[in-house]
Amino acid sequence: MKYASGKEDTFSYSNTSITSVVDGVSKTEKYNASGDIISVTDPAGTTTYNYRPDGQMISVVAPGQITTTFGYDDFGRQTTMNDPSLGIIRYAYDTMGNVAQETDANGNVTKKTYDNFHRLIKKEVAGQTINYGYNADNLIESEVSSNGTSKAYTYDALMRLNTLKETNVDGKWLKKTFTHTNGCISDLTYASNIGNIVTENYTYSYGNLSEVKLNNSTSIWKLTSENALGLTTGVNTGILTRTYSYDANGAPTGRVVKNGSTVIQNSGYNFNAKTGNLNWRKDNVRNIQENFGYDNLNRLTSFAGKTATYSNNGNITNISNVGTFTYNAEKPYAIALITPYGTEVPLREQQIIYNVLRRPETITENGYVATFTYNGEGNRVKMNLKKNNQVQLNRYYWGNQYEFETGVAGSKEILYLGGDAYSAAAVYVKEGSGAWVVYYLCRDYLGSITHTVNSSGGLKQELSYDAWGRLR
């Protein structure tokens, strides 16, 4: 298969095996007479798959003889999974065949109850009991957790979402009200326990979003141009103009943000057309370029003059500016020891305790203790931060879109506009009893925030990340 970029993927067949070269990586897959895959071989080694006579998989053996096994009952339902990282996970079923109980290697139990229509109506997990309700149209109507979090949904006559109210712990809540026009969301109104926040207004062109306004006045995002591939090439966000460029294959080559003639962001990118890997990125404002290299599995091996090496199972064994990594023999993907080369890794203890959902419950470091609360879906809804047992900050979260915090520095509300924390072009901020203020966000091609700009075009913050996404 040849592409206009010059990239070429190849496939060859021999009896029950397929050998492919995709993105420059060679791989051979072998199948049994039933069409089940029995092995995959690539430059990292061979992974084998073993089956019972009835076709159920009983084990997977990864490079390094890392083995995961599966057990079943007389009905062919999976009852155990023995994972070298997680330990033994056990499953039990109700009389209708639904998974009713899951027990992890630490003995933590998750229970689920279903109605006669196989809909989940109750879940007990991580010390919480969550009850689910449905309306006559079989749409989710409520999720209520014993820890005080909940979600309430209403719908219009066409079964489109009309309102969504998310209640957090401590009586905090956020409500979204949707208005639909011609099958698209035309308005989205936000309100919280503190008061009304704002309404976003959406305009469409041929069914595609073309503009977002606040309260039918301030334009916070407006599409101005696209290329022949349908990729966005021009956007206005308030006073800022944004220009995006691409190579012939659609890979990004540049992102420029200006306030008039003043350049705020000017980033350049170059990708390998055959593998899709990023060759280099450049901050054209500061004339700083970072080059990247990869191995035959497309893993990052060199970055900004530094190097990384890997074992056959994919574990990082060395980063030249950090140190060497040693892994647990019984849990082969778990780091047991880092031997640092310098000061990149702080020489102090950090303790993390996880809940049943394998999410951090507390993080303790350098006199600080962060405690996290989750809703019935396992999403973070609150962080409490203390230092020397004194509260420094309480921060509440709603779906990566709205945050409220209060602490020694005062209170703050944050609402991401036209998207969430990972995609929004603007953010609405209110500090203390002050007025709501719009800030515009510039991002790199991965979506990480690089610049924060006020509504007058003044730069308020600039951020930079290393090759691993760490703030620097």
PLM region descriptions:
Residues I18-S20, I38, T79, I121, ...:
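Short polybasic amphipathic segments
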Residues K2, K30, S34, I38-T41, ...:
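Residue-level markers of secondary-structure register and packing in elongated scaffolds
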